[in-house]
Amino acid sequence: NPASSLETPVLDKLASGGMVFDGAYHMGSFSGAVCSPSRRMIMSGRTLWHLKPTGKKRRKKGKKVAEPSGPNPHRYTLPAVFNKAGYATMRTCKNGNSYEGANALFTVRRDATKRGGTDSSGSAWHADQVLDYLSQRQKQKKKAPFLIYFGFSHPHDTRDGRPELLKKYGAVNHTDRSKLPPANASQPALPPNYLPKHPFDHGHTSVRDEVGVKGVWNKRDEYTIRNELGREFACSENIDIQIGRVLEKLEAMGELENTYIVYTADHGMAIGRHGLQGKQNMYEHTWRVPFIVKGPGIKPGSRAVGNIFLLDVLATVCDLAGIKAPATSEGLSFRPVLEGKKEVVRDVLYGAYCGGGRPGTRCVKKGDWKLTKYDVTKTGVRHTQLFNLKENPHEFIKAHQSPEVTPLTGVKPGPGQVNLAGDPKYAAKLKEMEALLLEEMRRHDDPYRLWNQPDDGLVVPVIKAKPDRKKPKKPRKPKKKP
């Protein structure tokens, strides 16, 4: 993004040497920890509602119907498939909120959560693990092909960056909740779609990401958001540096031009956009993911829409490696896009979030048009958004035109850059997108239906509240008198 003040020379070079996808997405989440189903989809190639290998039954008009079951992680996931094909597999990433059954199958596994501002406590640690692994391969003269899953703990909060990078982006590791962080001209500007508050309950207002991130908490003022963006930028540039170290090692080994490199993320993040902070929403800034692929046969400096999901990664890397993808994978290989033979692999994209109030948020995108619906039963919120993303890529809503907001962002949306759901001129388009959303929900075995949809005979899933596991403190015994 040339408009961003974030400096990522390594990723810029990777992009200029490969292909950038402008339409890459995660499918969604049924929990506040969006990274968990996102990573499980990468590992398994399964769609969102087919992830849980429960084998349970649900009722449909009085009849028992088998729930879609997920794959056995010991047989059909990314490391298992490549292990079987003779690859040496290695991973390093954060601990937790992932796919443990698959993670355990990597031949070499070095996971730890590293969100500090030093080499030993931050992103450099993850790079060190990959560099050590490659050095050992080189020393032992191993010839087997390799698959490396190279992940980081940052830029997930807490975003305690390296001091020199925090200084570069005018940020501080703010810890005093009673005060605002200091203003600094070096901080990133507010995003164009910044809001001081989301205008309605989006379904998960109490999740940790929205109220408990250290340095932000429930604040959405300019000082807090710009400082947190600076912290995110500091962490992101450090990741760029660490990726560069590994790419330099591959080049020194003579392997760089013989290796497919896929760069992506679990999800996006709001940090002030639309008045939100976390990842529990389906706006473009959070639903979309960055995606770059470089490797043999890919035209340098190319760009495509793609319309890909993270769950397509397994099918694609298998295709590139000449390995048969497991039958349990539901992903589509986007190799034809990489080779310039196609612009997209699917015409319609479906997304869901119901980690908070259910049914939650659903969205569907086709071409330039996107429909998002919010159905939060516990608060009675029922809201519909219709956007033409070509005309309104930032998904501006009426609140963005407020005289309290435009001076802060320096952006005044045009008259057509609003939610079009209530405009009679777009009634036909709204009806078309509503029908498309229902079709996608049925196709993906979404267990919920929204307020204006037929229930299809589905019994609303019952989500049991987690019991309070804290044991009551026992009263202290009085001390015996001497």
What positions do the PLM features span?
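Short, structured active-site-proximal loop/turn typified by the sulfatase FGly-forming signature C/S-X-P-X-R
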Residues: 2-39, 45-46, 50, 88-90, ...
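Active-site-proximal cap/lid insertion segments
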Residues: 1-5, 29, 113-121, 134-311, ...
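Polar, surface-exposed loop/tail segments
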Residues: 8-9, 42, 94, 256-262, ...
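Loop/turn elements at helix/coil->beta-strand transitions in domains of secreted/extracellular proteins
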Residues: 17-22, 84-90, 141-148, 256-261, ...
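Short, solvent-exposed loop/turn segments at the edges of secondary structure
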Residues: 35-37, 101, 284-288, 329, ...
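Catalytic-site neighborhoods of secreted/periplasmic enzymes
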Residues: 37-140, 146, 158-166, 341, ...
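Short, solvent-exposed turn/loop segments enriched in Gly/Ser/Thr/Pro and often Arg
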Residues: 1-3, 20-43, 54, 91-102, ...
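Non-transmembrane alpha-helical segments in soluble domains
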Residues: 11-16, 43, 79-83, 90, ...
